């Protein structure tokens, strides 16, 4: 607390946290609906030239939701890169409000150069690159954590008889499992496999499970130049349409895109 009774603040905070945990599973669908509506209204921070640093997908408010999901004991949340990204977005908003003298959250074009200069970036392009990268990191962390929370909720649903999540074959050893694409077996040391798996999952509009991404990231790099099979698969991946963005986000966070 900035001022006031520390014990009172701690008591209120504890009561609110208890109430949130007690009702979080019932409130989760409503929370996700509101989240999707807000993202639709304000767009994707990583893809917007004049982003709303607070309300957009990948913005500051999404970090609040991320923390709330973890505080509800629905799932763990990632740390490290997402915390750094959040701090960078806070710095941008602070600089924006210093430059404009107002409590703004939208980074307008007219403020790009001044904010970049205040934060020590060479130009507005460097600033926007950082904002986009940070927004992408926060968005991916939130989306993955929200999926984990949904999976946790479904796992606790009472069922008659033993519960076993179905594996739906998608092809090439890839399966759909609880809303994600997973590999059915430990991958062989095939550097083309990440592209093959990405194409299958993107066509099904499914994100890759974190464990599968980690396994793919551990595979060796593609040779230079790429073999024809890899080039054809990469072309197929770019042509997968609406399923590509969620797939690309996972590949980026796993550093696979950087290695290509």
PLM segments and residue spans:
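A nucleotide- and high-energy phosphate-metabolite-utilizing enzyme signature
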Residues: 1-260
């Amino acid at each position: 607390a900035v001022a006031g009774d520390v014990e009172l603040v701690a008591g209120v905070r504890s009561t609110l946290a208890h109430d949130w945990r007690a009702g979080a599973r019932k409130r989760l669908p409503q929370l996700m609906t509101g989240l999707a509506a807000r993202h639709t209204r304000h767009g994707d921070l990583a893809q917007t030239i004049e982003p709303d640093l607070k309300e957009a997908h990948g913005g500051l408010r999404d970090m609040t939701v991320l923390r709330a999901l973890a505080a509800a004991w629905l799932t763990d949340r990632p740390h490290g890169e997402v915390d750094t990204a959040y701090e960078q977005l806070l710095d941008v908003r602070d600089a924006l409000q210093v430059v404009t003298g107002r409590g703004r959250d939208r980074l307008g074009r007219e403020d790009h150069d001044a904010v970049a200069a205040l934060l020590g970036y060479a130009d507005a392009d460097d600033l926007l690159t950082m904002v986009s990268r940070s927004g992408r990191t926060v968005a991916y962390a939130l989306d993955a954590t929200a999926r984990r929370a949904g999976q946790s909720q479904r796992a606790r649903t009472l069922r008659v008889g033993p519960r076993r999540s179905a594996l739906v074959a998608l092809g090439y050893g890839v399966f759909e499992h609880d809303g994600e694409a997973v590999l059915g077996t430990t991958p062989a040391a095939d550097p083309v496999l990440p592209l093959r798996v990405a194409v299958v999952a993107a066509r099904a509009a499914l994100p890759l499970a974190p464990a599968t991404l980690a396994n793919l990231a551990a595979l060796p790099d593609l040779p230079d130049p790429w073999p024809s099979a890899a080039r054809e698969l990469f072309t197929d991946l770019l042509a997968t349409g609406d399923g590509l963005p969620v797939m690309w986000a996972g590949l980026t966070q796993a550093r696979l895109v950087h290695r290509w």
